[in-house]
């Protein structure tokens, strides 16, 4: 009987208020940034490459820059995203919106938090060594990890109902 009562009380089953608050704050923050980026045509094929150019340009150069120092990241971006910025701009548009909505509504929260972890690691690497305060991305990454580890969608989220109806998701990685 003790094992059953412990399982009922675990965050996996009942959720966590702390993870729920963190999930909502991170979700609304991501949505606000996404809306701002949309309003500035950030994801547009013509504007998107300029973001990466700015990140790796020296702050002392004409027009300034962030001065990121991880040249291997720049090489990867040059060989992938910057070869098809319009395509990857659209991909990022939907990935960032998907992360925000997943976190806000608590639907497929574990998958959304895994996507957020990858997204924030990417931002950390792009900004690393530059003028930007890098710890912002560490905090965002930490929040996404906490949401994943504490089953952030199991309280006040759609995942709570999905888990009751369907049981556990494959490998516990979706809801």
Residue ranges of model-derived segments:
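Extended, low-polarity transmembrane helix blocks
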Residues: 1-98, 105-175
